[in-house]
């Protein structure tokens, strides 16, 4: 699983011009699911995001998690996070999970996050969405469960 996480002042999703969901201060998460992903990846990624200290404390240091600031979360499915652009001019999406697996894991990821955080909103799976956001910072973090499962590198 791969997530592009953006700290936002606010974000919203529209489909066909209709407002589907919106959040105030919090995290906008673009979520991609690959063929290789396992059920355990849902918990690994959701736990990491819920505890990630990327909000500023009273000293301006990134030291607080989404839970500690009572922030909102907006999750948007995005299979294009698994685009392979190594050859040719058109991205190849064969590493992305098929729609049945992707929908299942997406729903489970959102449900798991809802157990960790007060307010979790979502886009519409497989819909063409207009996503609006106001970045806060900007702070953008990319997480991939393939990397999260590897041992930590030693500092040199």
Curated annotation (Swiss-Prot):
Enzymatic class: hydrolase
Metal-binding recorded as keyword:
no
**Biological process per Gene Ontology, one example term:** D-amino acid catabolic process
Which keywords accompany this UniProt record? Answer: Cytoplasm, Hydrolase, RNA-binding, tRNA-binding
Q: Which GO terms describe its cellular component?
A: cytoplasm
What does the record give as EC number?
3.1.1.96
Q: Where is this motif: Gly-cisPro motif, important for rejection of L-amino acids?
A: 137-138
**What GO annotations for molecular function exist for this entry?**
D-tyrosyl-tRNA(Tyr) deacylase activity; Gly-tRNA(Ala) deacylase activity; Ser(Gly)-tRNA(Ala) hydrolase activity; tRNA binding
The cross-references to InterPro entries, in alphabetical order and at most eight, read:
Daa-tRNA_deacyls_DTD, DTD-like_sf
Superkingdom field = Bacteria
Gene3D superfamilies for this protein? D-tyrosyl-tRNA(Tyr) deacylase
Subcellular localization is given as: Cytoplasm
Q: Which reaction does it catalyse?
A: glycyl-tRNA(Ala) + H2O = tRNA(Ala) + glycine + H(+); a D-aminoacyl-tRNA + H2O = a tRNA + a D-alpha-amino acid + H(+)
**Function in brief:** An aminoacyl-tRNA editing enzyme that deacylates mischarged D-aminoacyl-tRNAs. Also deacylates mischarged glycyl-tRNA(Ala), protecting cells against glycine mischarging by AlaRS. Acts via tRNA-based rather than protein-based catalysis; rejects L-amino acids rather than detecting D-amino acids in the active site. By recycling D-aminoacyl-tRNA to D-amino acids and free tRNA molecules, this enzyme counteracts the toxicity associated with the formation of D-aminoacyl-tRNA entities in vivo and helps enforce protein L-homochirality.
Q: How does it assemble?
A: Homodimer.
Q: What is known of its domains?
A: A Gly-cisPro motif from one monomer fits into the active site of the other monomer to allow specific chiral rejection of L-amino acids.
Question: Which family, according to UniProt?
Answer: Belongs to the DTD family.
- What name goes with this protein? D-aminoacyl-tRNA deacylase
Give the species this sequence originates from: Dictyoglomus turgidum (strain DSM 6724 / Z-1310)
């Amino acid at each position: 699983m791969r997530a592009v996480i953006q700290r936002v002042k606010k974000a919203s999703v529209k489909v066909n011009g209709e407002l589907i969901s919106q959040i105030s201060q919090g995290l906008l998460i673009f979520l991609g699911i690959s063929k290789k992903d396992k059920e355990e990846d849902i918990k690994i990624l959701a736990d990491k995001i819920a505890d990630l200290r990327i909000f500023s404390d009273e000293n301006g240091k990134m030291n607080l998690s989404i839970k500690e600031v009572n922030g909102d979360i907006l999750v948007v499915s995005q299979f294009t996070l698994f685009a392979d652009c190594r050859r040719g001019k058109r991205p190849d999406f064969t590493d992305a999970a098929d729609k049945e697996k992707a929908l299942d894991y997406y729903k489970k990821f959102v449900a798991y996050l809802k157990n960790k955080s007060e307010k979790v909103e979502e886009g519409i799976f497989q819909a063409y969405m207009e996503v609006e956001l106001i970045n806060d910072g900007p702070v953008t973090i990319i997480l991939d469960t393939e990397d999260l499962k590897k041992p930590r590198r030693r500092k040199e």
